[in-house]
């Protein structure tokens, strides 16, 4: 869990690489307003 970005931008970047840890967060971010 350490070393993984928890903010939206960082999560988007890891999501592009299909990061398994950030995948769930990316789904939540996609349902929220993207800024």
UniProtKB/Swiss-Prot annotation:
Tissue/organ expression: Expressed by the venom gland.
Keywords: Disulfide bond, Neurotoxin, Secreted, Toxin
Domain LCN-type CS-alpha/beta positions: 1-35
InterPro entries membership: LCN-type_CS_alpha_beta_dom, Scorpion_toxin-like_sf, Scorpion_toxinL/defensin
CDD domains named among the record's database cross-references: neurotoxins_LC_scorpion (cd23106)
GO CC terms, sorted: extracellular region
Domain of life: Eukaryota
Record has Secreted as a keyword: yes
Gene3D superfamilies according to UniProt: Knottin, scorpion toxin-like
Primary localization class, coarse: secreted
UniProt keyword annotation of Protease present: no
Gene Ontology MF terms: sodium channel inhibitor activity; toxin activity
Location of the protein in the cell: Secreted
UniProt record similarity statement: Belongs to the long (4 C-C) scorpion toxin superfamily. Sodium channel inhibitor family.
Domain notes: Has the structural arrangement of an alpha-helix connected to antiparallel beta-sheets by disulfide bonds (CS-alpha/beta).
Protein's job: Causes paralysis and death in insects (A.domestica).
Protein's UniProt name: Putative neurotoxin
